[in-house]
């Protein structure tokens, strides 16, 4: 969001409504930058919310998802509702509003355990957790809107990412923090 604003884009952010009026990580954005974009609170699972947020948008960068593999075993329905139904809502809205492009953010988890490396787009999809299965479902819905309705969709499947405000539970921030803390030996836990 910050980078798009700095590049001069007209940005609208869609955040999950909550009674605390928290905007999630956007609460930590530079206040001057926050003045430069619109924040719309709603729920990705609600088509009306998605339509209201996407009104007058040319491009949709779809990042909304329930993430976290462990919790998906306890609440698989929540992952299906958010990740699959939410993606369908985005795509239906994009079709109705004739959006120029939808960038759908998936995950490398859709590949499961690597059968070969490097992993390519031809690698089989393996839903090894409810989270991964829900993202596979979302990807397939996105592909179906491309083939059925010619909605321009790009699916990205990031592996390890890093950036501002990222949880230190992820591997790259863990390594970066240990290096900046001056540790001479990295502690990454069990690697076997």
Predicted features by range, described:
Residues 1-161:
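N-terminal Rossmann-like NAD(P)+-binding domain of SDR-like oxidoreductases, especially those catalyzing
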Residues 72, 123, 151-164, 174-192:
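A conserved pocket-lining segment of Rossmann-fold NAD(P)-dependent short-chain dehydrogenase/reductase
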Residues 171:
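Conserved catalytic loops of nucleotide-sugar-dependent glycosyltransferases that act on lipid-linked
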């Amino acid at each position: 969001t910050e980078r798009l604003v700095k590049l001069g884009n007209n940005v609208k952010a869609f955040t999950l409504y909550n009674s605390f009026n928290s905007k999630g990580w956007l609460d930590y954005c530079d206040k001057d930058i926050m003045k430069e974009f619109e924040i719309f609170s709603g729920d990705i699972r609600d088509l009306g919310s998605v339509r209201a947020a996407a009104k007058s948008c040319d491009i949709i960068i779809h990042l909304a998802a329930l993430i976290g593999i462990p919790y998906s075993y306890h609440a698989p329905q929540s992952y299906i509702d958010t990740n699959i139904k939410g993606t369908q809502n985005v795509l239906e809205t994009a079709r109705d509003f004739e959006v120029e492009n939808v960038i759908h953010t998936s995950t490398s988890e859709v590949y499961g355990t690597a059968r070969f490396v490097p992993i390519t787009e031809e690698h089989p999809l393996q839903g090894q957790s409810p989270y991964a299965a829900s993202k596979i479902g979302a990807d397939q819905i996105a592909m179906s809107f491309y083939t059925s309705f010619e909605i321009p969709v790009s699916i990205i499947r990031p592996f390890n990412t890093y950036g501002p405000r990222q949880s230190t539970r992820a591997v790259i921030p863990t390594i970066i923090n240990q290096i900046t803390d001056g540790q001479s030996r990295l502690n990454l836990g069990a690697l076997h």
